Amino acid sequence: LFELQDEGYRVFQAKLMPNISCDRIIGVRTPDLRSYAKKIFQMPEAKEFIQKLPHDYYEENNLHGALLSLLYPEDIETFLAELERFLPYVDNWATCDMLSPKIFRKHLPYIYERIKKWLQSDHEYTVRFGIVTLLDFYLDDAFDPEMLSLVANTESEKFYVKMAVAWFFSIALVNQYE
């Protein structure tokens, strides 16, 4: 990852995530990180890497998220087990929001039940992940008005949860105006 480092981008990223020490940010741009994940996901080291938690760097967490989707594109049970093992280590909004697994599209009713559990978590970014997942996958034909109450009743004083709630309602208003 250090071979992909962009020092200016590192400084920029640090300003966007004040809760992450600059020493924990390498400065790898997301398209480069995703390309790297596609290069390595078939290597045995990829599965070894996702087994080692916690990671030291912000980009390692992002790589972890990218690898999950590549390693388990069809196996929802294994994907969810690995995702739920990883979520407690997500420590910032950017890593959280980068997780948008395409596999969810094939399992919307099943994932919706998981979202309800994630919204009850004590972990800020697990709750945010649940809200962002609703935003990413359920504000189209999968929408149910119950989702509005579900998000509105999310109990958290955490800043990044409140921001996700506001974001959800802004997109819901646009996509589901009635």
Please name every model-derived segment.
Residues 1-178:
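Alpha-helical scaffold domains
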